[in-house]
Amino acid sequence: MGKISKEALKEQIKDGIIISCQALPGEPLYREEGGIMPLLVKAAQEAGAVGIRANSVRDIKEIKEVTTLPIIGIIKRDYPPQEPFITATMREVDELAALDIEVIALDCTKRERYDGLDIVDFINQIKEKYPEQLFMADISTFEEGLTAYEAGIDFIGTTLSGYTSYSRQEEGPDIELVDRLCRAGIDVIAEGKIHYPDQVKIIHDLGVAGIVVGGAITRPKEIAERFISALHK
């Protein structure tokens, strides 16, 4: 698909589930030669997914061969000692922009960045360089979400709540954060620690623009661990 208007994308993803299909080195479904993520995407599509979130140029290229669903793309690349690793610099934005995908997601937390830029300055740079591209901010707090939205980011994702040292630490999704962002009139894509269908229904009814579910669907090891640990509580 590629470039799409914000309103058209909102219409396409509303009332549905975007499924995150990712596997990193060291995880059971990761293979150096690839080929696994397209199979997960085909399963997600057959189930009725309205979009896909995917990581890396290789995976996204393979996924585009098997689906026309809108893609939220990221590149996870470490830049130690700085913590942000989700589309953390212009290098990753450039690589994703070349793939002609619907949405590019990036870390928009307040943490120190590898490029040394303030997050608003970085947002201004990417918006200027790619004015027709839709962007999603991965944030961990209300303040981060508000800052990114006011700077021109199209969608605010609650992806990193619980994954920064200063954000709310919960086993499940940060429903309070989702609700607060929605009440502020922000286009929210809820994501992060959504493990059960009843959580999806609660989040949907808050008025989100979209919902991303990942590990609870596409990480078999994580799913198995949840069942096994239930026997030992």
Swiss-Prot record:
It comes from Streptococcus suis. Its EC number is 5.1.3.9. It catalyses: an N-acyl-D-glucosamine 6-phosphate = an N-acyl-D-mannosamine 6-phosphate. This is Putative N-acetylmannosamine-6-phosphate 2-epimerase. Pathway: Amino-sugar metabolism; N-acetylneuraminate degradation; D-fructose 6-phosphate from N-acetylneuraminate: step 3/5. GO terms for biological process: carbohydrate metabolic process; N-acetylmannosamine catabolic process; N-acetylneuraminate catabolic process. Signal peptide: none annotated. Keywords: Carbohydrate metabolism, Isomerase. HAMAP family: ManNAc6P_epimer. CDD domains: NanE (cd04729). InterPro entries: Aldolase_TIM, NanE, RibuloseP-bd_barrel. The keyword Isomerase applies. One of its GO terms (molecular function) is N-acylglucosamine-6-phosphate 2-epimerase activity. Converts N-acetylmannosamine-6-phosphate (ManNAc-6-P) to N-acetylglucosamine-6-phosphate (GlcNAc-6-P). The gene is nanE. Changing residue 205 to N: In strain: 10581.
